[in-house]
């Protein structure tokens, strides 16, 4: 992926950059793989805001992605690489030999015309999906299952990959993009390679309006609010003393920096060898 940077013709374009979409080969999606996507505006079914700073944005259709890769031993040809407005990675349209069409996450290096397979005993090739027990140590993988047959849940965003570090007994040890080292059952599936579009993190939106196109609303600092609205509000100027403003907090009074919120009794904790914040 290549990024184009604009010159300072206007204040907005001074730092603005965007993808050239060179890897995208098709501009219109496959209609049979689209589903309606209703906007929530960050509200739950009671109409209350549960996720702040969401709302508006361009209308989208959801692209139905095959995270399970369950069509075993049937070759699939890559027909197109497409843009997906619902995720940071690109998606690939597969045409299976039996006539079915499916979308998958597009790995780095995948090209139109490539033939992909999924199953227990398939070649170690970018885009092929198989159980972790059949993947060699040191391989980079993405779209990793946490529960067999549920579909990939980890390493799915642009540029993400996990490294298979060890296999011992019924579990494989993976180093995840966050730095966490975690055990997963060796029957769980993963796809060879890393996700493409790895320059996504270098894109600068450049102006407020571009955030609004993406459905992101403005954020107001707690320190700029009144005490009735936020624990860090009030005071003369940028005051950090008194009224609970000494330590950064969320709008609901919870410490905002460094407080661990994960349930210590969670069953999957025993599978985490090293946390993502461990030094």
Swiss-Prot record:
<feature type="region of interest" description="Disordered">
    <location>
        <begin position="221"/>
        <end position="279"/>
    </location>
</feature>
<comment type="similarity">
    <text>Belongs to the universal ribosomal protein uL2 family.</text>
</comment>
<keyword id="KW-0687">Ribonucleoprotein</keyword>
<feature type="compositionally biased region" description="Basic residues">
    <location>
        <begin position="259"/>
        <end position="279"/>
    </location>
</feature>
<dbReference type="Pfam" id="PF03947">
    <property type="entry name" value="Ribosomal_L2_C"/>
</dbReference>
<dbReference type="InterPro" id="IPR012340">
    <property type="entry name" value="NA-bd_OB-fold"/>
</dbReference>
<keyword id="KW-0694">RNA-binding</keyword>
<dbReference type="GO" id="GO:0015934">
    <property type="term" value="C:large ribosomal subunit"/>
</dbReference>
<feature type="region of interest" description="Disordered">
    <location>
        <begin position="34"/>
        <end position="55"/>
    </location>
</feature>
<dbReference type="GO" id="GO:0002181">
    <property type="term" value="P:cytoplasmic translation"/>
</dbReference>
<dbReference type="InterPro" id="IPR022669">
    <property type="entry name" value="Ribosomal_uL2_C"/>
</dbReference>
<dbReference type="GO" id="GO:0003735">
    <property type="term" value="F:structural constituent of ribosome"/>
</dbReference>
<keyword id="KW-0699">rRNA-binding</keyword>
<comment type="function">
    <text>One of the primary rRNA binding proteins. Required for association of the 30S and 50S subunits to form the 70S ribosome, for tRNA binding and peptide bond formation. It has been suggested to have peptidyltransferase activity; this is somewhat controversial. Makes several contacts with the 16S rRNA in the 70S ribosome.</text>
</comment>
<feature type="compositionally biased region" description="Basic residues">
    <location>
        <begin position="40"/>
        <end position="55"/>
    </location>
</feature>
<keyword id="KW-0689">Ribosomal protein</keyword>
<dbReference type="InterPro" id="IPR014722">
    <property type="entry name" value="Rib_uL2_dom2"/>
</dbReference>
<dbReference type="InterPro" id="IPR022666">
    <property type="entry name" value="Ribosomal_uL2_RNA-bd_dom"/>
</dbReference>
<protein>
    <recommendedName>
        <fullName>Large ribosomal subunit protein uL2</fullName>
    </recommendedName>
</protein>
<dbReference type="GO" id="GO:0019843">
    <property type="term" value="F:rRNA binding"/>
</dbReference>
<comment type="subunit">
    <text>Part of the 50S ribosomal subunit. Forms a bridge to the 30S subunit in the 70S ribosome.</text>
</comment>
<dbReference type="InterPro" id="IPR014726">
    <property type="entry name" value="Ribosomal_uL2_dom3"/>
</dbReference>
<dbReference type="InterPro" id="IPR005880">
    <property type="entry name" value="Ribosomal_uL2_bac/org-type"/>
</dbReference>
<dbReference type="InterPro" id="IPR008991">
    <property type="entry name" value="Translation_prot_SH3-like_sf"/>
</dbReference>
<dbReference type="InterPro" id="IPR002171">
    <property type="entry name" value="Ribosomal_uL2"/>
</dbReference>
<dbReference type="GO" id="GO:0016740">
    <property type="term" value="F:transferase activity"/>
</dbReference>
<dbReference type="Pfam" id="PF00181">
    <property type="entry name" value="Ribosomal_L2"/>
</dbReference>
<feature type="compositionally biased region" description="Gly residues">
    <location>
        <begin position="232"/>
        <end position="242"/>
    </location>
</feature>
């Amino acid at each position: 992926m290549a990024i184009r940077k604009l010159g300072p013709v206007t204040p907005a374009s001074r730092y603005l950059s965007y993808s050239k979409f060179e890897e995208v080969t098709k501009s219109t999606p496959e209609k049979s793989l689209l589903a309606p996507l209703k906007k929530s505006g960050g509200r739950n079914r009671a109409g209350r805001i549960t996720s702040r700073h969401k709302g508006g944005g361009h209308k989208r259709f959801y692209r139905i992605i095959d995270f399970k890769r369950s069509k075993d031993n049937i070759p699939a040809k890559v027909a197109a690489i497409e843009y997906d407005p619902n995720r940071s990675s690109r998606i690939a349209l597969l045409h299976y030999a039996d006539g079915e069409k499916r979308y998958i996450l597009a790995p780095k290096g995948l090209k139109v015309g490539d033939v992909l397979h999924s199953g227990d005993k398939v070649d170690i090739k970018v885009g092929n999906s198989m159980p972790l027990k059949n993947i060699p140590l040191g391989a980079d993988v993405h779209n990793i299952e946490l529960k067999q047959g549920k579909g990939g849940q980890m390493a799915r965003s642009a540029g993400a990959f996990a490294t298979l570090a060890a296999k011992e007994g019924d579990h494989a040890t993976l180093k995840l993009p966050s730095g966490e080292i975690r055990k997963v059952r060796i029957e769980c599936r993963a796809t060879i390679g890393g996700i493409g579009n790895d320059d996504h993190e270098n894109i600068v939106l450049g102006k407020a309006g571009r955030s609004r196109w993406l459905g992101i609303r403005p954020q107001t600092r707690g320190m700029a609010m009144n005490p009735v609205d936020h624990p860090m509000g009030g005071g003369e100027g940028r005051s950090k003393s008194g009224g609970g403003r000494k330590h950064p907090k969320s709008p609901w009074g919870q410490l905002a920096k460094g407080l661990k919120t994960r349930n210590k009794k969670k069953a999957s904790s025993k599978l985490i060898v090293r946390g993502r914040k461990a030094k």
